[in-house]
């Protein structure tokens, strides 16, 4: 199977899917209304890989299947340390803003709606989140994924700065 942009092979991962939202659309034609559906699906292995997809079709099941296929093409790696994220993130997509804060073990996944689905599929167990601005599930999911993409763990920071881990934590 082909690699995604980050070199992740979705075929080698044990991806599960979670349906976030289904929307029914209508097209008015001469004989009445034609209904279509679109589905937002989040896929992940609950071990640090997560992606989202949008599927559109005339039937709900077909839309979900297309969403899953699209989600497998957009899988990203999320650094998870002791069940939480390494640092606080504020991510924005459109007018949707998502704030994610690391939490101590035992706190649980405190998130609502679309953000919860993304974090569950990523495998994050302890995190505090707040969704601000738009509650449109399309934009909230995209903001959450953008935030998770932007996380950098200490090894990445040390490599970018050409320093050791000890030097990074001292500065």
From Swiss-Prot:
Record carries keyword Hydrolase: no
UniProt signal peptide: none
GO molecular function annotation: rRNA binding; structural constituent of ribosome
Positions in coiled-coil regions: none
BP-aspect Gene Ontology terms: translation
Residue ranges annotated for the S5 DRBM domain, each copy included: 15-78
Tree of life domain: Bacteria
Cystine crosslinks: none
Entry domain remark: The N-terminal domain interacts with the head of the 30S subunit; the C-terminal domain interacts with the body and contacts protein S4. The interaction surface between S4 and S5 is involved in control of translational fidelity.
Similarity annotation: Belongs to the universal ribosomal protein uS5 family.
Complex formation: Part of the 30S ribosomal subunit. Contacts proteins S4 and S8.
UniProt cross-references to PANTHER family, sorted A to Z: MITOCHONDRIAL RIBOSOMAL PROTEIN S5
Identification of the protein by name: Small ribosomal subunit protein uS5
């Amino acid at each position: 199977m082909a690699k995604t942009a980050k070199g992740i092979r979705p075929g080698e991962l044990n991806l599960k899917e979670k349906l976030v939202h289904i929307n029914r659309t209508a097209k008015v034609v001469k004989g009445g209304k034609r209904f279509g559906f679109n589905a937002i699906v989040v896929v992940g292995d609950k071990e640090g890989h997560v992606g989202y997809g949008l599927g559109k079709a005339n039937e709900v099941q077909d839309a979900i299947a297309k969403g899953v296929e699209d989600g497998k093409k957009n899988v990203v790696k999320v650094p998870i340390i002791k069940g939480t994220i390494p640092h606080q993130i504020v991510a924005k997509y459109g007018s949707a803003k998502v704030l994610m804060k690391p939490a101590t073990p035992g706190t649980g996944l405190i998130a609502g709606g679309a953000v919860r689905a993304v974090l569950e599929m990523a495998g994050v167990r302890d995190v505090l989140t707040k969704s601000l601005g738009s509650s449109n599930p399309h934009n909230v999911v995209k903001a959450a994924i953008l935030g998770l993409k932007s996380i950098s763990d200490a090894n990445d920071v040390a490599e970018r700065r050409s320093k050791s881990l000890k030097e990074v934590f001292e500065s």
